[in-house]
């Protein structure tokens, strides 16, 4: 990933249906959304792909990215409750919103070893492999279908997974990935 096109930050959310009707106030400060502007939150959950901030500074703009995500969440729920989704969601209520964003990237620190896709796919053995993982490399990009209304700051992503990872075997992450090669006494994780 380059500085333009970083992966973003997610703010997940959840909703439920109550036994009786639940009101929801208009949210003029939220993003102006209708049901077609976002994927329907199946299973009462807005998952990881409610993500924005791709071309923003993940540290300097962290609060702005989070605020945009929250405006998207509340705008989507407003569409469900007060706009074209209102008939179907009379009993729906917002039950949880992650007010702390989950960033995918921040500083790009380098250890003595940089684990590559080739290392993972070829099951390269490292003598200091200390953390097992079975997750493939995935990159997140704005989903074009939902980026039309806010092309400069889309808030729905999709993931592209790299070459297959043998999930039964996984791969060991070397200890040398976790400390900085040029900043003394700095240990990294994430």
Question: PLM ranges: what are they?
Answer:
Residues 1-189:
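Flavin (FAD/FMN)-binding glycine-rich loop and adjacent Rossmann-like elements that form
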